[in-house]
């Protein structure tokens, strides 16, 4: 993609550009926001301003056009999740990038150096979404000790230009990251200082990196101390000098250390399962065939405690002639049902979508996106399965008060986990329950599913789900649902889950559901349910029974809660063989059965 590099002069924005080039992206321009003339630094939650006088030199160093804009706004909207706010400093960024687009209409993405700052990330993502661009944030959630070392070994020469933390003094100003690395790690152990300065402990100025055709040399520097005496920074003058040794950098050059797809824990799971388990050859066993899911004509509705559950929401017969019309009718019916309870689309926590064919995924999303086009939309799982009716879309959702909701909606591409550029959040936490969206084994940095090792894909998808859970600061694990497209993969999924729970010490059942297809032709989709860590007493716990239900197939699972919780209905797609188990989830209180998932045979009433 053609990329605009947002630069502050600091190490993070520059190092992210190195990752962009390593991944094959072409940086076509640079952009920077700076204080008004005569100001060395401003109090901004969003932008690094110290050292801004040197920024014009970066155009010559990169040999790229540089676009700049004065910061005229203030931090008016200080919520973590940003929405358009007049005179906010984020709107300065919007105007800047919009101006760049007029000169570079083929621009596709924006590079940003966000590591831990949700405040910064959500604002860049908001601007990118409004302008039809992607956000590339390859440093997001990276381990800071490793990241600091990666910067040093990659030839990024950055000096400390501001210090504002215990243990850092004016004597450290002007020192390089390489010179400061040991001290920063020592301060991390003593005082929990962020090694990469994510707590505002220090700021840097990049003098050279492999992408620079020329390097920056300081010609004068002056230490400026704040009135408190604990914060000081360098006011510098600089010039550009040639780099006779510089060689042109081609796209996909190895400018940064290789990023392993699997973390240590999941790499161990992968190698353990690979040694113990061989996928069944296609010729050795015939995959199980799916039986179409029977649908009821009326929607399932239950309001209990803090939650409302709506299931079996379909279009109105005779109200549509096209698939788009069916999608609009189904969503209108969902909206009407919500209205009868005094709710709107913003009250929805989680949505389960079943399509008759995954070929309709993009077309459905185009309609769905219009309905849930707001900050932090519901989390979601979407699968395809044959439906025993004329309907091609079935939806179920869990609903509640928005005042109790917090969300994770990361839209920038990174190495962390797949970006959710679609109309759903990675996770929603509400009323003590954390709903994780279904996760598939996409390679997050490129958002592609191009793995030829099915076990690796399954483990990677589980890692994605767990990383989302960690970012949500979840409590105890309640249950796991794994969708598979081939019945022969079920045993492997169970073994992976067993190894995962053994390593983590968590105890939770896994339910494996057979479907016709998953997004991107994935082999598995993991969907996790957690208690919120803020609850003194976990709302839900789980155990597996050996109850067996007989029937030609099973169609629905039903979850029941008492007045403190929810009744949840989501579609289960099973084959002709009956389930050999049921799952029971109970409140920690012995006399209160909070959640009971049961399988209902096709010919039984739900």
Swiss-Prot record:
Record-given protein name: Diphthine--ammonia ligase
Top-level division of the source organism's lineage: Eukaryota
GO MF term list: ATP binding; diphthine-ammonia ligase activity
Record's GO cellular component terms: cytosol; nucleus
Gene giving rise to this polypeptide: mug71
Principal EC category: ligase
Catalysed transformations (reactions): diphthine-[translation elongation factor 2] + NH4(+) + ATP = diphthamide-[translation elongation factor 2] + AMP + diphosphate + H(+)
Functional summary from the UniProt entry: Amidase that catalyzes the last step of diphthamide biosynthesis using ammonium and ATP. Diphthamide biosynthesis consists in the conversion of an L-histidine residue in the translation elongation factor eEF-2 (eft201 or eft202) to diphthamide. Has a role in meiosis.
Listed pathway(s): Protein modification; peptidyl-diphthamide biosynthesis
Entries under InterPro entries matching the protein: Diphthami_syn_dom (IPR002761), DPH6/MJ0570 (IPR030662), Rossmann-like_a/b/a_fold (IPR014729), RutC-like_sf (IPR035959), YjgF/YER057c/UK114 (IPR006175)
Any single biological process term in GO: meiotic cell cycle
Principal subcellular localization: cytoplasm
A Pfam family assignment: Diphthami_syn_2
EC number: 6.3.1.14
Subcellular location per the Swiss-Prot or TrEMBL entry: Cytoplasm; Nucleus
Positions of transmembrane segments: none
Family stated for the protein in its record: In the N-terminal section; belongs to the Diphthine--ammonia ligase family.
Keyword terms of this UniProt record: ATP-binding, Cytoplasm, Ligase, Meiosis, Nucleotide-binding, Nucleus
Tagged with keyword Nucleotide-binding: yes
